[in-house]
């Protein structure tokens, strides 16, 4: 099921884990890899249903994955950005079945402003968070591991004890680790036979698809200095 706003979402019962991140963080690709279904997140040239809250179950209607609209909305008009920021806020604050987040961040651009806001908010709600540094294949092993270490140190500075890993949907790096995390929270196994509701599947934006073709020589712009200004702020979305 897909819902344009909180009031139209599926019944607020059971257990949900939401996938969140910027619109170009590789969210659709990660979901496809996790579920072993290449077309789970179907491609689209328009934002369309990617600007909806998308629910689908892992064979059990009481255990759901939720694909949230990517924050950033690069190709979306300003009015729609404001509307969806409000709907995202409503979901995150009021959804009682929401038990945790998988937060996706491009390894070359981790801990952007909205990422830190999401982390602070999740901490304030006492949700579990598992962080994916996506597109790890874009960096060599040494630089990728350094970004992982830098982000861990920044999380420690922020007094956040969230789990974090490297991930690449292209070469499946970190897929088993992610599957293990999901298995610890849901009745989930990395299995091609899972029964998904394909009518309730989010579509990938053109921006998502184009981003997969970005120059692999691009280096990380991670800098802990831009985090300091947010450490003492009250969590908000």
UniProtKB/Swiss-Prot annotation:
Annotated InterPro entries: G_ENGB_dom, GTP-bd, GTP-bd_ribosome_bio_YsxC, P-loop_NTPase
Gene Ontology biological process: division septum assembly
Occurrences of domain EngB-type G (ranges): 13-188
Top-level division of the source organism's lineage: Bacteria
One example GO MF annotation: metal ion binding
Biased composition regions of type Acidic residues, renumbered to the chain: 207-220
Biased composition (Basic and acidic residues): 227-237
Keywords associated with the record: Cell cycle, Cell division, GTP-binding, Magnesium, Metal-binding, Nucleotide-binding, Septation
Cofactor annotation: Mg(2+)
Residues annotated to bind Mg(2+): 28, 50
Cited Pfam families: MMR_HSR1 (PF01926)
Chain sites annotated for binding GTP: 21-28, 48-52, 67-70, 134-137, 167-169
PROSITE patterns: G_ENGB
One GO CC term on file: cytosol
Region annotated Disordered, chain positions: 207-237
Protein purpose: Necessary for normal cell division and for the maintenance of normal septation.
Stated family: Belongs to the TRAFAC class TrmE-Era-EngA-EngB-Septin-like GTPase superfamily. EngB GTPase family.
PANTHER family membership: ENGB-TYPE G DOMAIN-CONTAINING PROTEIN, MSS1/TRME-RELATED GTP-BINDING PROTEIN
NCBIfam families hit by this protein: GTPase_YsxC
Name of the protein: Probable GTP-binding protein EngB
Gene from which this protein is expressed: engB
